[in-house]
Design a protein with these regions (language model features):
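Conserved pre-motif C helix in the palm subdomain of viral-like polymerases
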Residues: 96-127, 205-232
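Conserved polymerase palm-domain catalytic core
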Residues: 144-243, 247-264, 282, 330, ...
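Non-catalytic, polymerase-adjacent accessory regions of viral genome-replication enzymes
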Residues: 1-69, 378-379
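Active-site-proximal segment of RNA-dependent polymerases
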Residues: 30, 114-173
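Conserved phosphate/pyrophosphate-binding and hydrolysis machinery centered on Walker-type P-loop NTPases
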Residues: 57, 61, 136, 208, ...
């Protein structure tokens, strides 16, 4: 056996091993399991959380088993279960977002597709530092990973370093459907399950919609190849991504610039454009913003995590609006107290001593002191 034959034999052995592992990952996560009435029934009880007060959800739940059986039969006979979208706009942190929500009958199917099919198979291929839309992860997880990366960098190099912060322009609206399908085909063996998932993607002429669980999960896995390339080819262990936001901690500014050029080129291949007004290279000692928090690495190695100024201003304004609605009798005082406790609870996890004092003072001025003044005046 010559060298070429040995290489070919080794390749075939490794390919067979990968195919076997792929087959094992897909066991129990097939089209038949996803579309079974029992899976759909469990998906309904999970999907109704937080929205059980809606009349449409209650109507579906009255005959949940009958509805699940009918839906299962329709899917297996190749019928289209889509009833169109419920479209509306919301304002999130001053940014207008267009939401495309689906009816409860379709949401149940999406829940089953995600929980019983896509997520158990595809999440195993994600890097650990991909923190969005996964059980046990989230914004707090992403912030803690950043702090851990900064501590690791400091122990090795001190504060002499830079961080590349990246942000994408119109991320959901730029996603290529062919790449989404290619990513699923790499991990999922059941073609019928892939076709079912694509039924929730294809109605969008371009990109993916906000408000769909399937679209949310597929967006998380969209740049998975780039994530692995940064971690394994570039050997950047201090890299993390949260949906369309990412960071890389680098030794030098030139290294960060080289990575930025790679991201611009690679993201362009995926149809995504980096928002260069928000993408920046910052010296670690200068402080930077990550997921709405202002982060500082001090010369002692201590990390200061302060809430972003924009979120503080936004919540102060919201508290003032709530106070006006309480005065007009539109909402009870308990609503204001709930918002105040929630905001203080968030700030208590930050280095925000003065911010907490300012919120306390504002709440007292809006509610407590004014109430006491009126009690004295009318006594």
């Amino acid at each position: 056996m010559n060298s070429k034959e040995r290489h070919e034999a080794r390749y075939l052995r490794r390919k067979a091993k990968r195919d076997l592992a792929k087959q094992k990952r897909n066991e129990g996560h097939t089209f038949d399991v996803v579309t079974s009435p029992e899976s759909l029934r469990r998906a309904f009880y999970s999907a109704r959380k937080g929205v059980n007060w809606k009349a449409s959800v209650q109507r579906y739940g009255v005959n949940v088993l009958r509805n699940c059986i009918d839906t299962s039969e329709k899917i297996r006979h190749g019928e289209n279960i889509s009833k169109g979208f419920i479209e509306f706009d919301i304002s999130e942190r001053g940014k207008k977002r267009h939401i495309t929500s689906v009816h409860i009958s379709e949401r149940v199917v999406q829940k089953s597709v995600c929980d019983n099919g896509i997520v158990p198979v595809m999440e195993k291929s994600l890097i650990y530092d991909n923190g969005a839309s996964q059980k046990g992860k989230g914004t707090d997880f992403a912030r803690e990973r950043l702090k851990k990366h900064l501590h690791q960098f400091y122990r090795k190099y001190g504060t002499d370093g830079y961080i590349l912060l990246g942000d994408c322009h119109d991320f959901f609206g730029s996603i290529d459907h062919s790449i989404v399908k290619r990513n699923m085909e790499k991990m999922i063996t059941d073609q019928r399950l892939i076709d079912l998932a694509m039924q929730f993607v294809d109605p969008f002429p371009r990109g993916l919609g906000l408000g769909s669980q399937v679209c949310q999960i597929l967006a998380v896995t969209y740049q998975n190849e780039i994530d692995h390339c940064i971690k394994e080819v570039w050997r950047k262990k201090w890299y993390a991504r949260y949906m369309d936001d990412f960071y890389v901690i680098c030794r030098t500014k030139d290294e960060a610039k080289e990575l930025l050029a790679y991201f611009i080129e690679k993201y362009r291949e995926y149809g995504i454009e980096l928002n260069l007004s928000k993408t920046q290279i910052v010296k670690l000692t200068h402080g930077f913003v990550w997921l709405q928090d202002r982060i500082y690495l001090l010369p002692t190695g201590r990390i200061v995590d302060k809430p972003g100024r924009s979120s503080l201003v936004r919540n102060r304004r919201k508290l003032k609006k709530i106070a006006k609605r309480v005065d007009r009798g539109e909402i009870p005082f308990n609503n204001a107290l709930t918002f105040y406790n929630s905001h203080i609870g968030y700030l208590s996890h930050k280095d925000a001593y003065h911010a907490i004092k300012n919120v306390d003072k504002l709440f007292n001025d809006l509610f407590i002191r004014r109430f006491m003044y009126e009690q004295v005046r009318y006594a």
